[in-house]
Design a protein with these regions (language model features):
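Short Gly/aromatic-enriched secondary-structure transition segments
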Residues: 46-54
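N-terminal secretory signal peptides that target proteins for export/translocation
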Residues: 1-4, 302-303
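Structural recognition of the beta-strand scaffold that forms the well-ordered cores
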Residues: 31-42, 69, 79-83, 129-134, ...
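Mobile gating loops/cap/lid regions near enzyme active sites that modulate substrate access
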Residues: 179-197, 205-258
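Solvent-exposed, polar/charged alpha-helical surfaces in well-ordered, non-transmembrane soluble domains
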Residues: 69, 73, 113-116, 151, ...
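Conserved SGNH/GDSL esterase-like catalytic core that processes O-acyl groups on lipids
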Residues: 54-151, 155
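C-terminal membrane-anchoring or membrane-association module
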Residues: 294-303
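Short, threonine-centered small-residue motifs that mark membrane-proximal processing/anchoring sites
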Residues: 3, 7, 12-28, 259, ...
Length: 303
């Protein structure tokens, strides 16, 4: 009887060790792969069109690196960025008149073509890669702030996530829609806020298990409500108004009417990193549990 109990304890200890190893590996990413729009584009649109021009920084829709660049840097991994500024979640791109279901005048891609084009680069997928799938705002800009637009956008994102999982992706981060009603271009637009809420509700309800969701909406509201806590003195007007650039961009939440400053991207990247990295307390609890079981096992075997 004691032998059987001891064996059971050994199995428990082994299971906890496996769980700890799994959590550790989840944090040991070896690459970040990004799909999205101007919030993630690190120069893809610029390389093909020359947009956006200065004072936008090196093809970013900001005054410096964007969130996924800071995330990859913090995780000490290379970044494979397939995001294009203007991309909808579907076929087309807002930048050349495309929409969720069709290309525009110049064939600029949405997120579905981004994934298709990337397949030759990302397959076979490594188990240690982190995928970031973030999009949706351009769908509203092209098709309007309606539930139909949101439903299609969510379905597109779920499809991309599903395709990645079928290809073997084990770590996928899906940030939600920011509160578009807090951006300078749509400040006070209750419809923009309502559709942001609706979009996020539908997205969360349909995401497969194991996919990491980040609540961008709530975090943005937190920053706007107490900007000084995050180092911002201005949270509702753009640093760059299309003509002149403010003298202190690091104190602005928004670079232009729709995009955050690189200072804001640094902060958001830190939040993304927390979302995809196991808390140290998790390892502490597992370690304590294993130590306790080991002690019980020792007593049982010596009894």
């Amino acid at each position: 009887m004691q032998v059987r109990k001891a064996a059971s304890l050994v199995v428990c200890v082994a299971a906890m060790l496996v769980a700890m190893a799994s959590l550790a590996s989840a944090g040991a990413y070896t690459a970040v792969i990004s799909y999205g729009d101007s919030l993630s584009d690190n120069g893809n649109l610029y390389a093909h069109t020359g947009q956006p021009p200065s004072p936008y920084w090196m093809g970013r829709f900001s005054n410096g690196p964007v969130t996924v660049e800071y995330l990859a840097n913090s995780l000490h991994t290379p970044l494979m960025d397939f995001a294009w500024g203007g991309a909808t979640t579907g076929v087309g791109n807002y930048g050349d008149g495309g929409n969720q279901t069709s290309f525009g005048a110049h064939g600029l891609p949405g997120m579905q073509p981004e994934l298709s084009v990337s397949l030759g680069t990302i397959t076979p997928i490594a188990s240690t890669w982190l995928f970031v799938v973030w999009g949706g705002p351009n769908d509203f800009l092209t098709n309007g702030f309606t539930t139909a637009t949101a439903d299609t956008a969510v379905a597109n994102l779920i499809g991309i996530v599903g395709d990645l999982k079928l290809l073997g992706a084990q770590h996928i981060l899906v940030p939600g829609m920011p509160d578009l009603g807090l951006t300078p271009d749509y400040l006070g637009n209750t419809g923009a806020t309502a559709m942001s809420i609706y979009f996020n509700h539908e997205l969360v309800s349909l995401l497969p298990s194991g996919v990491i969701y980040f609540n961008t909406f709530n975090f943005m509201q937190e920053v706007v409500a107490d900007g000084s806590a995050f180092g911002f003195t201005n949270v509702n007007t753009p640093c760059f108004n299309g003509i002149t650039v403010c003298a202190n961009p690091d104190q602005y939440l928004f670079w232009d009417g729709f995009h955050p400053t690189t200072a804001a991207d640094v902060i958001l990247a830190g939040q993304f990193e927390k979302a995809v990295t196991p808390e140290p307390s998790t390892f502490l609890m597992l370690g304590t549990g294993i130590a306790g079981l080991a002690g019980v096992l020792k007593r049982k075997l010596s009894a």
